[in-house]
């Protein structure tokens, strides 16, 4: 449990009862956050969880107003590239890049948590000329990782427009937990 979790919903009575027993034993003050979901629409459909689960294994993650981030974990580091795609505003190219980068910063922090990615992370945001915009994106990324229980350190934007950061490895990444390497490919292919 973290402070940003308001509630946990479980849609099956016996699972709810087991979770409640567990919480009463381990964290009794949080049992009031546990609820039995009784809606007609399945819980996973209501909150689009299947879509989120499917998306978590994809390399490219679409952003809400267009654009995307591309996540490439390697043995050495995690490279994340921000692409503008169809994202447009009526403002200047600089302002458009700034707005997209702000959106991307929030999604990058979210994806790092969801995928359990750690180590060195290099974020290649869309180039911005204005110093105040570069600092604004750094601030947005710092604010977005505050919810993360993993320790993070974010450096200032490099002369190449990259924001380097580190994120504590709490457990093996989702990719390493779900997939196994194919021996015939010498580690370049994966099987789920």
What feature does the model see in each segment?
Residues 63-192:
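Conserved glycine-centered short motifs in functionally critical loops
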Residues 1-69, 74, 159, 177-192:
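OB-fold/S1-family RNA-binding modules
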